[in-house]
Amino acid sequence: MGDDGPGSTVHLLCLAASSGVPLFCRSSSGGAPSRQQLPFSVIGSLNGVHMFGQNLDVQLNSARTEDTTVVWKNFHDSITLIALSSEEGTSELKLERMLHMVFGAMVLIVGLEELTNIRNVERLKKELRASYCLIDSFLGNSELIGDLTQCVDCVIPPEGSVMQETLSGFAEATGTAFVSLLVSGRVVAATDGWWRLGMPEAVLLPWLVGSLPPQAARDYPVYLPHGSPTVPHRLLTLTLLRGLELCLLCGPRPPLGELDPQLLERWWQPLLEPLRACLPLGPRALPDGFPLHSDILGLLLLHLELRRCLFTVEPSKDKEPSPEQRRRLLRNFYTLVATTHFPPEPGPAEKQEDTVHPAQTPRACYLVLGPGMGWQLVAVQLGLRLLLLMLSPQTPTHGLRSLATHTLQALTPLL
């Protein structure tokens, strides 16, 4: 599997489909934002070959050269997005899902009408600048994984039931059904209304909050790409502790001024210690002291029906490889698993089998990285849950499936 080296670059091009006029170009190098721009001749050639295929009723989706993978995607016959990656072995699935998230981010900020009925290109360029911070986070080495899995990044708080009860009461007091508590862009707790949000906004909204500079409070207009792409809503955020924010998705009411400190103190002051215990959960995802095998270097757990996931590389963080490498390896392993071994989500036959045979034998695959590294990656699926583990070299290969199955059973009550 490919690994991002220091020289790997990702370029993202956005063009008006009808005219080919570039709306923006964003780049990253080695996982960090970069000012490197592609020459206009290259941009024109990439768009030209795509348009040439369309004129011949040929859909050009992707292409590979010796050192670059290219993916094209047209949205609503109005916006063309092109992704180029020099990461060794990068998959089309990864780039295609990134393009879907980028377009979702554009709709989230400016609305679908502005993108499908472009009246003034220069004005649209200016409006899209507000989405750059969010878009750039998809190009870099994020600690989140929802952009790839299309599942909401979650954490498990130590006192989840108390947190959920307080959140529901606060939502009722403020008169909105869509409320969540976020830490570092991950959902700690949310109301039923928030969980019913469709994709991609269910992933994009926490990701947006995590990408914005810290503020005590915000009143941010957003469109919902799935639920309300042409009529804006208000995203209100309130910082309880640094890195821990309340989010409310609402209409004209309530005004931000009504969410005064007294209201917050009444609901959240009694939970001050549980709230503080949530702060380390950003990178860790699991409560402190949760029993995990010492050989586990990282894990990704997905609930394929609820569209939620847990992602952490914190276990045994004093061992090699680095947390950044672990995240990249698990992301790459997920793309391999999703495209080769397991379908993205259960089909009707599998769901029927879940009902008829509740006690299933997990489906599994594993990969040993080498030479010289020896890190082991294993995936096991049981019903609606898929678990990916990264394990240290000393883990015996014959014990991978058993370790993964026991870990999945231990994590199942959490997600």
Swiss-Prot record:
One of its GO terms (biological process) is cardiac septum development. CDD domains: Fuzzy. Its main location: cytoplasm. Keywords: Cell projection, Cilium biogenesis/degradation, Cytoplasm, Cytoskeleton, Developmental protein, Protein transport, Transport. It is found in: Cytoplasm; Cytoplasm, Cytoskeleton; Cytoplasm, Cytoskeleton, Cilium basal body. The keyword Lipoprotein does not apply. It comes from the Eukaryota. Signal peptide: none annotated. GO terms for cellular component: cell projection; cytoplasm; cytoskeleton. GO terms for molecular function: phosphatidylinositol binding. InterPro entries: FUZ/MON1/HPS1_longin_1 (IPR043972), FUZ/MON1/HPS1_longin_2 (IPR043971), FUZ/MON1/HPS1_longin_3 (IPR043970), Fuzzy (IPR026069). Component of the CPLANE (ciliogenesis and planar polarity effectors) complex, composed of INTU, FUZ and WDPCP. Interacts with CPLANE1 and CPLANE2. Belongs to the fuzzy family. Probable planar cell polarity effector involved in cilium biogenesis. Proposed to function as core component of the CPLANE (ciliogenesis and planar polarity effectors) complex involved in the recruitment of peripheral IFT-A proteins to basal bodies. May regulate protein and membrane transport to the cilium. May regulate the morphogenesis of hair follicles which depends on functional primary cilia. Binds phosphatidylinositol 3-phosphate with highest affinity, followed by phosphatidylinositol 4-phosphate and phosphatidylinositol 5-phosphate. This is Protein fuzzy homolog. It comes from Rattus norvegicus (Rat). The lineage of its organism: Eukaryota, Metazoa, Chordata, Craniata, Vertebrata.
